[in-house]
Amino acid sequence: MKSLFAKLIKASPEEVAPHFSVSSAFGALLSAFDYGRRNEIVISDMEYPTSNHVVLGQEKFGANVITIKNRNYRVDPDDYRKVTGRKTRLVSAVHVSSLNGFIEDIRSIGKVAHDVNSEVYVDAYQSVGNVPIDVKKDDVDYLTAGTLKYLLGLPGLAFLYVRKELIKELEPAYIGWFSQKDPFQFGAEKLDYADTADRFQSGTWAIPALYTSITGLKVILKEGVPSIREKIMKLTRQAIDLGMELGLRTISPQNDQERGAMVSFVVREPHEMENMLRNEGIITSSRGIGLRIAPHFYNTPADIEKAVKRIAELNAR
């Protein structure tokens, strides 16, 4: 299981730990942090809400959270550079925003963090499985992702990547028996952390989610992420072009290279429209002012045409 995910992000299995969700994985990571003079966590409002919630929870332990506001649904490395400095403990970036599919330049954002001797954390939930990831080339320190979205799995399984050079420097407080060298040691009077990223593990895994997700990971690896990326770019391009032709406005990037596997259209009553479309067998997701479609490699141009035309029809009523 760990080796499959590690292969997907170009890491080693020893740098990967399974968790229950990105929320729990990120929380486990931050539970290893101490906040002294370097107490600032930099994050943006383009992240999925859980990241903002988890870092705000660190304020009771001395963290100071700095939130970057997006400009027209995007944030750039310069936005991070303006607010990082000698007090920065961690820079948090979302690889692909669930709001509109914007792809952040995680390599450049990581350089911003490293230039001030800080570290970079990446939420890759919306990119893993559809956008190629190489944690070594991108110089990523920490990364999380889950299997529910583009990895074709179930809720209940996520992964935390920790760069091997950092593992032994961190002693998390949010742990369980799987975090120890000997998980079966009864009556322990001191902690004996695993030497690998397993030290960030907690308790018993969600076994049904695990087995389903193993199959999903194998499918993605067999299909190949570069191939998936190429197909999805064509489908999202089709969605944007057709939507504009039908009078829809999108908050997703027009540049194919800046867009992940989703397109968000601005519609009236997004949540209500989501429910109406679901009843018709068209699965979308309302996020803020937008209604999001998120094709995968198994979708077809006909699927896109049907969905976008129906969205335009309902929005015109």
Regions found by a protein language model. Name each.
Residues 1-317:
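Pyridoxal 5′-phosphate
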